[in-house]
Amino acid sequence: MNKERRKALNELKFKLESISFELENIYDEIESLKNEEQEYLDNIPENLQNSQRAERSQEIIDYLEDTIEYLEDSKSQLQNTIINLESALEE
């Protein structure tokens, strides 16, 4: 691989690593919000546990859990992409 293409691939790898870092931050924030919502739901008084608000809270938790799962898949795929680029850059 010539110097120019190697430099371009290194720049792309750096961009992917930056995206990976940002994705990790987003993942952490969503997980934290899900935990807060779960704590809220866990502390709803017994007489309100079947209320519309409690049901909506559970729906939100379910959506956030799905989102976390999708982000885990995305993080894994992104890591595999970075590893492949590193392999391409080996001399």
Language-model features: locations:
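Long, low-complexity or tandemly repetitive, helically biased scaffold regions used
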Residues: N2-E91
